[in-house]
């Protein structure tokens, strides 16, 4: 299996201005990344009468247990006043051993 650099992946994800409800391409990016790692992927759209449709990425690796489930989200709330940030929220930066970004 291909190795992944978690810090670089986090930086790549932060670069997407995926402000709710726009995903800015981050879901497609992550789907391609996971597919290259051997995951079977599928985008599922959930919708009902009271909410706008929401896309979800479902990814599975293998078919035997034990199983591990990760549930997260790819969108963020607006960053607010950019003058309040010490860095551009969508240009990740490592400072003093900490990754800073939105």
List the predicted regions and their residue ranges.
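Active-site metal-coordination/substrate-binding segment of hydrolases
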Residues: 67-102
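Pyridoxal 5′-phosphate
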Residues: 1, 7-8, 36-41
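Acidic active-site catalytic centers that drive phospho-/nucleotidyl reactions
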Residues: 7-9, 23, 75
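Hydrophobic aliphatic residue packing
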Residues: 14, 26-27, 76-77
């Amino acid at each position: 299996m291909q190795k992944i650099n978690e810090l670089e992946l986090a930086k790549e994800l932060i670069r997407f201005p995926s402000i709710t409800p726009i995903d800015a391409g981050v879901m497609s990016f992550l789907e391609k990344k996971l597919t290259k790692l051997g995951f079977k992927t599928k985008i599922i759209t959930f919708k009902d009468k009271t909410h706008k449709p929401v896309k979800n990425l479902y990814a599975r690796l293998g078919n035997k247990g034990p199983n591990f489930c990760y549930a997260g989200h790819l969108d963020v709330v607006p960053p607010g006043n950019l003058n309040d940030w010490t860095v551009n929220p969508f240009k990740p930066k490592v400072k003093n051993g900490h990754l800073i970004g939105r």
